[in-house]
Amino acid sequence: MGHKDFLHKLLSGDHFSQEEMTQCMNAIMNGVFPDTVIAALLALLEHKGVTSTEVAGAYYSLIAKANTIDLSPDAVDTCGTGGDHAGTYNISTIGSIIANSTGVSIAKHGNRSVTSSCGSADVLEELGFRIDLPVEATVELYARTGFSFLFAPLFHPSMKRVAHIRKELGIRTIFNMLGPLINPARSKRQLVGVYSSELMELYTEVLLQTGTRHAMIVHAMTEEGVSLDEPSLNGPTYIVEIQNGYVCRHTVYPEDFGLDRHPLSAIQGGERKQNAAIIRSILDGSASPAQIDAALYTSAMACYVSGHARCIDDGLTISRESLESGDTDRKFREILDFNAELSARYREAVN
């Protein structure tokens, strides 16, 4: 099929088969289509509504092109879709840092901001973490600390083809959905925050197909009526849990875990300097209760899917103990120090 065939199909409101989506994505990533066509395809897909079959087709295209890394299938990824436009600080990033300090291995897949003011790569860089270490250095960092950040452009070089188009479009696209699925470490334990409730079933279908071991797909609402791609501190959090092929669904509230309710404004952030300052204040204990609770809530879920905690309650307890004792701050300083040592030892891997 040529680009006109793909465009006509989308303009008619028809869905792609898995094979058609793989073919279309291959053409996009291999530079067959010009920028204008790619932008039109991405916008029309989003307008039509992406199906689980289309996401699976795109997944198989991108994962075949990825530079994979050998860590551990039990490492947890907290990469979410982003794109909820709630303006929160980088909660999943600090959540993964806290979880790591409790003994959870982390293989966080992430990138610079596309639809937000500050992506996980942006805030880690602002905190002094070099995000673009070569693969062998990332393996060393993980071996010593159990923490790794998998910078998407390094492991998915074909994504450079669409980076500027995504930035110029400034809207959610199928690539937001793919981020949590194409972890180059092939993580089988995941905490996936999604920006809409409709995506929960889509991710369930795709993760079952791709063989996850234990995943929680999370979507939440606030009292203000705002959708979140992370647990809510003042409204319901909807969870689809997948464990060894079995699926169950939960709805939880902050008070179920002894957490106070806080308005959305209490956990909002901004640009990278502001978000990095919030994370530093969480690490040193000077952050607001809301900022700390949001981080602990996410860490608790990461601890649970890792198998390190028996339940979310247990995960919350060990996360709080690690943060309040100073263990999280000490562990993150260790990560930063070794990251700097590796940075001095290895040449830049990606521009």
Curated annotation (Swiss-Prot):
Binds 2 magnesium ions per monomer. Pathway: Amino-acid biosynthesis; L-tryptophan biosynthesis; L-tryptophan from chorismate: step 2/5. Anthranilate 2 binds at R166. Pfam families: Glycos_trans_3N, Glycos_transf_3. Mg(2+) 2 binds at D229, E230. Its cofactor is Mg(2+). One of its GO terms (biological process) is L-tryptophan biosynthetic process. Mg(2+) 1 binds at S92, E230. GO terms for molecular function: anthranilate phosphoribosyltransferase activity; magnesium ion binding. The keyword Glycosyltransferase applies. Signal peptide: none annotated. Keywords: Amino-acid biosynthesis, Aromatic amino acid biosynthesis, Glycosyltransferase, Magnesium, Metal-binding, Transferase, Tryptophan biosynthesis. Anthranilate 1 binds at G80, N111. It catalyses: N-(5-phospho-beta-D-ribosyl)anthranilate + diphosphate = 5-phospho-alpha-D-ribose 1-diphosphate + anthranilate. GO terms for cellular component: cytosol. Its EC number is 2.4.2.18. InterPro entries: Anthranilate_Pribosyl_Tfrase, Glycosyl_Trfase_fam3, Glycosyl_Trfase_fam3_N_dom, Glycosyl_Trfase_fam3_N_dom_sf, Nuc_phospho_transferase. 5-phospho-alpha-D-ribose 1-diphosphate binds at residues 80, 83-84, 88, 90-93, 108-116, 120. Homodimer. NCBIfam families: trpD. Belongs to the anthranilate phosphoribosyltransferase family. Catalyzes the transfer of the phosphoribosyl group of 5-phosphorylribose-1-pyrophosphate (PRPP) to anthranilate to yield N-(5'-phosphoribosyl)-anthranilate (PRA). This is Anthranilate phosphoribosyltransferase.
